[in-house]
């Protein structure tokens, strides 16, 4: 792992230890297992694609380590509603909400607020390094979790995926290169995200998705992540047979995020 990833993972482990002192694993698991109604994250993406539209996972993100504060006027419920409405014709399929506090200025309440304000399935965007977080994700209302291959061993990914599926959640596994993709394809989840941002250098290139696309089997649903800022970026990816996208920064900088989404994917 890179220095920044090592730092993030170390902080996560501290956060998990503190959280378990407040709510032990057994109690968190019981809470998660009591929440039986999830929204169909994968189904929402596939429905958009079947309708000939882009399947957009629209991100709610206040800040990032590389860009600092991205959106000052940050009201998750309003942003979620804007994404869900779009322009009436083009809108988000799902939401992604940052819950990491230290590096992205997120928090679990943002996910709860966003989910309560619309009917879209919600992905918890955070760095999962312990089974406790998977139960915690469902307890806070998440319909899907992110598994970042660069942060996890194969056994951890398989364990976390199994827990997520047992709770009715989807798992989006994120990769950046061919070796990580090979590992991701061993999992059961059909959701594979290719991050165009190198988490070691934070450099961004759409060529990452384009070059790896051919290695993704047709039964998997490929999601392009990061660096999608212009209609030409969207065209480049669509020409490579990519139909699902995770976009955040481009929308967060717009006064009306849903309108920006509709314009980008018109």
UniProtKB/Swiss-Prot annotation:
Pathway: Amino-acid biosynthesis; L-tryptophan biosynthesis; L-tryptophan from chorismate: step 4/5. HAMAP family: IGPS_B (MF_00134_B). Belongs to the TrpC family. PANTHER family: INDOLE-3-GLYCEROL-PHOSPHATE SYNTHASE, TRYPTOPHAN BIOSYNTHESIS PROTEIN. This is Indole-3-glycerol phosphate synthase. The keyword Acyltransferase does not apply. It catalyses: 1-(2-carboxyphenylamino)-1-deoxy-D-ribulose 5-phosphate + H(+) = (1S,2R)-1-C-(indol-3-yl)glycerol 3-phosphate + CO2 + H2O. NCBIfam families: PRK00278.1-2, PRK00278.1-6, PRK00278.2-4. InterPro entries: Aldolase_TIM, Indole-3-glycerol_P_synth, Indole-3-glycerol_P_synth_dom, Indole-3-GlycerolPSynthase_CS, RibuloseP-bd_barrel. The lineage of its organism: Bacteria, Pseudomonadati, Pseudomonadota, Betaproteobacteria, Burkholderiales. GO terms for molecular function: indole-3-glycerol-phosphate synthase activity; phosphoribosylanthranilate isomerase activity. GO terms for biological process: L-tryptophan biosynthetic process. It is an enzyme of class 4 (lyase). SUPFAM superfamilies: Ribulose-phoshate binding barrel. It holds the Pfam family IGPS. Its EC number is 4.1.1.48. Keywords: Amino-acid biosynthesis, Aromatic amino acid biosynthesis, Decarboxylase, Lyase, Tryptophan biosynthesis.
């Amino acid at each position: 792992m890179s220095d920044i990833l090592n730092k993030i993972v170390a902080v996560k482990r501290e956060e998990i230890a503190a959280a378990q002192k407040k709510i032990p694993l057994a109690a968190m698991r019981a809470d998660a297992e009591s929440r039986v109604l999830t929204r169909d994250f994968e189904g929402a993406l596939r429905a958009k694609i079947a309708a000939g539209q882009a399947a957009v996972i629209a991100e709610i993100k206040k800040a990032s380590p590389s860009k600092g504060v991205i959106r000052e006027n940050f009201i998750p419920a309003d942003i979620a509603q804007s994404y869900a409405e779009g322009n009436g014709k083009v809108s988000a399929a799902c939401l992604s909400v940052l819950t990491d506090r230290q590096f992205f200025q997120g928090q679990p309440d943002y996910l709860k607020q966003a989910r309560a304000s619309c009917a879209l399935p919600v992905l918890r965007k955070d760095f999962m390094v312990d089974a406790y977080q998977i139960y915690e994700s469902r307890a806070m209302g998440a319909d899907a979790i992110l598994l970042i291959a660069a942060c996890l061993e194969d056994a951890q990914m398989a364990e976390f995926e199994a827990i997520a599926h047992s709770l009715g959640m989807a798992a989006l596994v994120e990769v950046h290169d061919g070796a990580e993709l090979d590992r991701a394809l061993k999992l059961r989840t059909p959701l594979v995200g290719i991050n165009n941002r190198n988490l070691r250098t934070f450099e961004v290139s759409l060529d990452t998705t384009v070059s790896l696309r051919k290695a993704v089997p047709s039964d998997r649903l490929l999601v392009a992540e990061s660096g999608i800022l212009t209609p030409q970026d969207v065209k480049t990816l669509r020409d490579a047979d990519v139909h699902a996208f995770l976009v955040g920064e481009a929308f967060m900088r717009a006064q009306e995020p849903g309108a920006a989404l509709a314009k980008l994917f018109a």
